[in-house]
Amino acid sequence: AFFLCRHYIEDQPELVKRMKKEGHIVGNHTSHHVCMPETDSRKVREEITDNANYMKEATGYEMDRFFRPPKGEYSERTLQITKDIGYTTVFWSMAYLDYDVNNQPGSDYVINHFEKYIHPGAIPLIHNISKSNAEALDTVLTNLEKEGYTFHSLSDLKKG
C-alpha cells in the first residue's frame, strides 16, 4: 500500500496512476502532512477529503479508504473523525529512519533491520522515496519468503 500526500500526487500523477493500474492500494496521508491532534476537526476532515478529491481530479482514480496519520500522531477525536468519514486508520509495527533522501541508512541496514524486527503480522513502514529501500527490497522479500512469510494487502487484513 502507498499512503500519499497531495504534493506527491501533484509531482507524480503518472506514477500514481500506475500504482492503481497495478492493483496497489493508494491510501490517504492528508493534503499537507499536518499534525492531526493539533488540527481542529473541520480542518482534519478537509485534509483527508481534499486529498482524496484531488487524487480523483488529477488521476481519475479513487483513493482507497485507508488512512495513515502523518508521523503516526493521532487522538481519540481524530480516530473518530477518520472513522466517521469512512476510513480505516492504519499504523505500522516496524519502522526506521528512511524518509530523509540526504541521509539514507544503506541497503545493508534495511536488510538487517528486517531480519531483526520482522514478526508475524508485521506492517512495515517503508518510504517510497528511499534509495536504500529500493536497493534492498528484492533481497528483503526473498529472505522473508525463505523464512515462510507471506504477504497480504490491507484489504485482506480488513476482511479478517
Region annotations inferred by a language model:
Residues 73, 78-117, 149-160:
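His/Asp/Glu-enriched short active-site or ligand-binding loop at hydrolase and phosphoryl-transfer sites
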Residues 1-39, 43-64, 143, 156-160:
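Active-site beta->alpha N-cap acidic-glycine motif
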Residues 5-7, 31, 70-72, 94-97, ...:
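Active-site beta-loop-alpha junctions enriched in small/polar residues
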Residues 3, 10, 38-45, 72-73, ...:
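Soluble non-cytosolic domains of exported or imported proteins
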Residues 14-17, 21, 42-49, 53, ...:
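Solvent-exposed, polar/charged alpha-helical surfaces in well-ordered, non-transmembrane soluble domains
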Residues 1, 120-160:
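Terminal accessory/targeting
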Residues 30, 69-70, 138, 142:
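Proline-centered helix-kink/hinge sites
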Residues 1-4, 25-28, 65-69, 88-92, ...:
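Structural recognition of the beta-strand scaffold that forms the well-ordered cores
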